[in-house]
């Protein structure tokens, strides 16, 4: 599959854009995930500040705190086909904080979070240990495919 079959609507909704991964990076990370698919795929990637992420986490999951990544799968109406998988929302401040806290290079952690969120759109989860182990294995494989070391990357539980 070529990367032009993966269409990303990249929304930069955070105040500080300095140092964010560029569109080409997001495209390569997402394309690595969906390289096995032979059909057109679309998703929205939205980069937000902590205030918006806190609100989204509270509104949709009833958790009164911000988080690093949220995924919102799209389910088309019955009888309608759509290449849209859904939305992945990433919180800039939390991802940058985690990167420093875990001593992981920034680009590597951004890649991990977009991969993690995109896998949720495909139905992967980490609620129970067996699912978490599988999701972590898939994340590690994709991160390696993208050229990142994976010793410090684990799915958030």
Curated annotation (Swiss-Prot):
Keywords: Cytoplasm, Endonuclease, Hydrolase, Metal-binding, Nuclease, Ribosome biogenesis, rRNA processing, Zinc. GO terms for cellular component: cytoplasm. InterPro entries: MetalPrtase_cat_dom_sf_prd, YbeY, YbeY_CS. Coiled coil: none annotated. It is an enzyme of class 3 (hydrolase). Its cofactor is Zn(2+). Its EC number is 3.1.-.-. GO terms for molecular function: metalloendopeptidase activity; RNA endonuclease activity; zinc ion binding. Zn(2+) binds at residues 116, 120, 126. GO terms for biological process: rRNA processing. Pfam families: YbeY. Its main location: cytoplasm. Binds 1 zinc ion. SUPFAM superfamilies: Metalloproteases ('zincins'), catalytic domain (SSF55486). It comes from the Bacteria. It is found in: Cytoplasm. Belongs to the endoribonuclease YbeY family. Single strand-specific metallo-endoribonuclease involved in late-stage 70S ribosome quality control and in maturation of the 3' terminus of the 16S rRNA. HAMAP family: Endoribonucl_YbeY. This is Endoribonuclease YbeY. It comes from Blochmanniella pennsylvanica (strain BPEN). The lineage of its organism: Bacteria, Pseudomonadati, Pseudomonadota, Gammaproteobacteria, Enterobacterales.
